[in-house]
């Protein structure tokens, strides 16, 4: 274009022949397909990002996590995961409505963006669950340092529709390869640690260890036993 922009064009070439079937010339038609390309790019973005916050979604995050683990395995370095779950978000959603809840999630995403490093991946897994992937030889110390910053940042209110909302968060931390050698295990164990942070009083962070999984398994078995006892007794 005259202003230096490059436009994607679709070229269609047709043959023109005379009455004897002899090719005499060609006709080329150029069509601007910028809008089509923009639509395709937008659809691709929406397939891999959360519509509300525009953060990477679970699909894109899982793909990145797999690749980062493969690279960490080859190069022999560590990575860390922070599994972040908002405390009492459902209360706000139920009392003030989903519109306020959605806007709060947008504000939370923006605050988290301001805290993570450029090399980190921040994603929304769904609902009020966020996760941070820390690369480049991340350790428990660096992960705990970021978790402390997140918890401290959530001490400040979130302004939504003229209302100051206070909400905390519980964070579970895992480090590869010590706390999981694959993406599924690493994320599952971070989730387990997050729930322990909630059990410990919320508004804090917990590092995963094997005892947490055993405690979680025992709790599930106890819940099943209690449900069975109630069912059989009824």
How would you name each of these model-derived features?
Residues 37, 41-48, 54-81, 87-117, ...:
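Conserved long alpha-helical elements within nucleotide-processing catalytic cores of c-di-GMP signaling
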Residues 11-13, 30, 168:
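Sensory-domain boundary capping and coupling elements
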Residues 122, 149, 153, 159, ...:
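Cyclic nucleotide signaling catalytic output domains
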